[in-house]
Each structure stands twice: as structure tokens, then as C-alpha cells.
From Swiss-Prot:
It comes from Arabidopsis thaliana. Seedlings over-expressing SAUR32 display reduced hypocotyl elongation and are defective in apical hook maintenance when grown in the dark. Belongs to the ARG7 family. This is Auxin-responsive protein SAUR32. GO terms for cellular component: cytoplasm; nucleus; plasma membrane. Its main location: nucleus. GO terms for biological process: auxin-activated signaling pathway; regulation of seedling development.
Length: 121
């Protein structure tokens, strides 16, 4: 079991089901995104995101901010525009990977070290 799976299971064990199941497609999860003082927005993300290094960093920041006892929907404490940027990076990698261009994926987790601090307000 990878780190992302452990994090996801921990969040699931400590949160209530506040989102209607029919509202979220199979294989996806609803989250809230927004930093302090910013209106939070709801996003539906594929569960595959939870194994991506960038998304794991966002989950780590959520853990640091709220702990594992946050109630309801998982909340990611970053600016919505920064989350959209991360989402575009993840989706771009997934489209390259799904397009059988496996040789274009380089670096693993280390390729994101320059982005680690960009999520903090």
C-alpha cells in the first residue's frame, strides 16, 4: 500500500459522508480547495490523484493544517488557482501516460521538489 493510499484511508476513516454519492462519479472523490480568507471551491477529482506526489504534498499540508480529524469533505488549504495548476500538471501527465508515451515520464517524486513550497500562502 502506497503513501497516498494510506493517507486516503486515514482521511476516509476520520470523515463523515457529507457528499451525496450520486453527485460524485465512481472512481472520484469530492474535495474542497481554498486558502484562509478565500472562498472554498468544490472539486471532483479522480482517486488516482491520491497517489501523485504533488497531490500527496497537498494532502500533507491539509494534515498539517487540520489534522486527520477534519470533519466532512477533505479540505486542501491552498489557493484555488494553484490547485488548478497542480490539477493541470497531473492531468497532463495522465494524458501522456495514457497515450502510451511512457518514455516521456522522468524523475518520479524528485521532479517536483521545486514546487513543494509553492502551496503555502
Amino acid at each position: 500500500m502506497g503513501t497516498g493510499e494510506k493517507t486516503l484511508k486515514s482521511f476516509q476513516l476520520h470523515r463523515k459522508q457529507s457528499v451525496k454519492v450520486k453527485d460524485v462519479p465512481k472512481g472520484c472523490l469530492a474535495i474542497k480547495v481554498g486558502s484562509q480568507g478565500e472562498e472554498q471551491q468544490r472539486f471532483i477529482v479522480p482517486v488516482l490523484y491520491f497517489n501523485h506526489p504533488l497531490f500527496m504534498q497537498l494532502l500533507k499540508e491539509a494534515e498539517d493544517e487540520y489534522g486527520f480529524d477534519q470533519k466532512g469533505t477533505i479540505t486542501i488549504p491552498c489557493h484555488v488557482e494553484e490547485f488548478r495548476y497542480v490539477q493541470a500538471l497531473i492531468d497532463g501527465e495522465r494524458s501522456v501516460y495514457n497515450g502510451n508515451n511512457h518514455h516521456h515520464r522522468h524523475g518520479g517524486r524528485d521532479q517536483y521538489h521545486h514546487l513543494v513550497g509553492c502551496f503555502r500562502a
